[in-house]
Amino acid sequence: MKRRGLKFLALGISAALLVGTLAACGSKKDSASKSSGDNSFVITLYPDVAPITCENFEKLVKDGFYDGLKFHRVVEDFMAQGGDPKGDGTGGSTDTIKGEFSQNGVENTLSHTRGVVSMARSNDPDSASSQFFICYGDESFLDGQYAAFGKVTEGMDVVDSFVKVERSMGSDGAVSSPNTDIIMENVKMIDDDSDGNPRVEITMHDFLK
């Protein structure tokens, strides 16, 4: 699908990023393209941009909440979404948090570009809990509507490989539902980056076997 058509589709399936209402790469590679290890990738959190969101995400990671959960929705050239204990886009963690984005009265300067991680939510701007999505390209039309809080800084090739899994038509009207579970086997905090930003390493189950 051409990019223009994709944008139209993305707008039409914004529900893919909504929880409970059922949720361009250049030729030059950056460091995010390099895998941090076998089937793992690293997300750097930016608490200066979204402190409430980062605190919530870090707590869930430390509690082991994400271990064994899957990416239940993968839309090529758009995003990959996971973090739902129900595995179908309708669940979340116990607590919801304030949506840190401009339409909810909070300044957020992190744009939804390739590798950026943001929170999924329902129509209620303060309904985000555990579900998150990773952008495959420039999805800046989502800016101001969702709380971007981190970025894949190592191993984006692993996230890219999600689209290699055969998918069926999802409830969002797109070919987005993986026929093979894409499972987060282990999610843990690792050393902060050189600027003191927290980092999370996600090791995936070998879903391409």
Model-derived regions: residue spans:
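Cyclophilin-like peptidyl-prolyl cis-trans isomerases
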Residues: 2-14, 18-209
